[in-house]
A protein has these predicted regions:
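Acidic (Asp/Glu)-rich catalytic clusters
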Residues: 17-25, 45-62, 95
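Short, acidic/polar
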Residues: 11-21, 84-91
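Glycine-rich, proline-tolerant flexible connector loops at the mouths of alpha/beta enzymes
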Residues: 33-46
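Hydrophobic faces of well-ordered beta-strands that scaffold small-molecule active sites
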Residues: 3-5, 27-31, 61-65, 102-104
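Surface-exposed, active-site-proximal loop segments in enzymatic domains
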Residues: 41, 68-85, 110-122
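An active-site-proximal structural segment forming one wall of the substrate-binding cleft
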Residues: 81-102, 106
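Conserved small/polar residues in nucleotide/adenosyl-binding loops
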Residues: 131-137
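Active-site beta-loop-alpha junctions enriched in small/polar residues
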Residues: 6-10, 32-35, 66-69, 106-109
Length: 138
């Protein structure tokens, strides 16, 4: 298993690739084209540019998180077939760029939810956490 770090991409992450490169053992990032909307096709040249930026920093791309599945696909609207075609072409373009891992984002609406965004750990660091019992029930 390789140690990787999530990087949101140029202009979307306060942590730079130079900083990530300084973390011992980290040779790759999990990244995305953050500005792309669900259902939109990722063009080969956009993927190549993202890959170039990461590789120029001395890192590799271990995978993509995520090529979002549009709500149009999920509920079968008139745009679903177009979005499915865009999804297929995006996966093909990622494969052609030698990126073979895509994490599927299954979370609806809010993308991710945690009950705490800064739970303090024993060493004083913080991490996101989820405790089901702290959520309101109806």
């Amino acid at each position: 298993m390789d140690m990787t770090l999530r990087w949101y991409g140029p202009g979307y992450d306060s942590v730079t690739l130079k900083q990530i490169r300084q973390i011992p053992g980290v040779k790759n990032v999990i990244t995305t084209l953050f500005g792309k909307q669900a259902g939109e096709r990722w063009l080969p040249e956009e993927i190549a540019e993202l890959k170039r930026i990461v590789e120029d920093a001395g890192l590799g791309i271990a995978g993509i998180e995520s090529v979002n599945v549009s709500d149009d696909i999920k509920i079968g609207t008139a745009k679903a077939d177009e979005h499915i075609d865009n999804y297929i072409k995006t996966l093909q373009a990622l494969g052609e760029a030698d990126i073979h891992v895509v994490c599927y984002n299954f979370m609806p609406v809010f993308d991710w939810t945690r009950s705490e965004l800064a739970r303090e750990r024993a060493d004083g660091s913080t991490a996101v956490s989820y405790t089901h019992l702290t959520l309101p029930t109806n």
